[in-house]
């Protein structure tokens, strides 16, 4: 009888050990997932900020062109930021957002920026009254808004995933 009780206790301890090992493994996996999500989140605030800078600086550039104050440096600055947002090149240390919606909106915005630059050249040649610069600027502003909102949405999705992993980790530790 004593022998059966000893085996039962040993079996229970083994089961508890296996359960604890599984819970530790789950916790390690959750921590790895959290680290991956955090690495994706790092830099998104900078991307959101620079996407917003493009929106405002483009409006400034159009205003300057309308008032016949050329600013090639501002155009180059905008080119550099858009390139950094799209290709992670340049000196702004911008990260890539792995979000299809954001990437699509950024591509559309970048393509339209090229058209807007052509219109800026037309303003310089024939005056803003004879171009569609104001309307194009408004369209571009809305595109830039959509790009910023897509980046914010991506950031929020990652933050939600991290929060879920935190909750699961806490639950795992309580078990």
Where do the protein language model's features map onto the residues?
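Heptad-repeat alpha-helical coiled-coil/4-helix-bundle sensor or tether segments in soluble regions
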Residues: 75-130, 136-139, 143-146
């Amino acid at each position: 009888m004593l022998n059966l009780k000893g085996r039962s206790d040993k079996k229970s301890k083994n089961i508890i050990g296996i359960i604890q090992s599984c819970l530790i493994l789950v916790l390690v996996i959750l921590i790895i997932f959290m680290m991956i999500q955090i690495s994706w989140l790092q830099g998104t605030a900078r991307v959101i900020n620079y996407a917003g800078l493009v929106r405002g600086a483009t409006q400034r550039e159009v205003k300057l062109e309308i008032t016949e104050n050329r600013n090639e440096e501002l155009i180059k600055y905008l080119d550099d930021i858009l390139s950094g947002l799209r290709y992670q090149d340049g000196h702004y240390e911008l990260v890539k957002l792995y979000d299809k919606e954001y990437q699509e909106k950024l591509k559309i915005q970048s393509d339209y920026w090229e058209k807007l630059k052509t219109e800026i050249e037309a303003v310089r040649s024939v005056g803003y009254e004879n171009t569609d610069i104001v309307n194009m600027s408004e369209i571009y502003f809305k595109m830039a808004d959509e790009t910023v909102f897509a980046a914010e949405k991506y950031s929020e999705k990652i933050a939600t995933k991290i929060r879920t992993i935190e909750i699961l980790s806490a639950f795992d530790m309580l078990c």
